[in-house]
C-alpha cells in the first residue's frame, strides 16, 4: 500500500503528497517563510 503524507499547519491539512521528502522540503520552506511551525504526517 502506497503511503500519502499530509502537510499540516496549526492542525489544519494544507496539502498532500505521495513523497515524504517532497512533503518535508515544503514544510521546511513554509516554516521558514511564515515563521509558523509546519509538520508532516502520514495519512491513512
Curated annotation (Swiss-Prot):
Name of the protein described by the UniProt record: SPbeta prophage-derived uncharacterized protein YosI
Domain of life the protein comes from: Bacteria
Amino acid at each position: 500500500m502506497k503511503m500519502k503524507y499530509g502537510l499540516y499547519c496549526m492542525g489544519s491539512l494544507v496539502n498532500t503528497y505521495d513523497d515524504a521528502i517532497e512533503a518535508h522540503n515544503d514544510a521546511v520552506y513554509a516554516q521558514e517563510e511564515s515563521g509558523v511551525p509546519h509538520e508532516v504526517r502520514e495519512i491513512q
